[in-house]
Amino acid sequence: MKTVIIEYSTIIPNVLKKIITNAFPTAICTWKDLDEDYFEFTVFGVLDLAMLEDVIAEYM
């Protein structure tokens, strides 16, 4: 499991979910609003966390 906080101006959650599920077909993504500028994004079901971090790092 990996949880990060991302700014909406960087990427929206639905697009990030699509990118991650294309790269990791077993991934399950959830998110929740923190405020109008940020959301908390969590990914489950990915074994290669280093590669997942590389993908997410582009949007943090």
Where are each of the predicted segments found?
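A generic structural signal for beta-strand entry/edge sites
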Residues: 1-3, 36-40
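Charged low-complexity stretches with an acidic bias
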Residues: 4, 24-28, 57-60
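Short amphipathic alpha-helix segments
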Residues: 7-27
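Short amphipathic alpha-helices in soluble, non-transmembrane regions
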Residues: 19-21, 51-60
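RNA-recognition motif
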Residues: 30-36
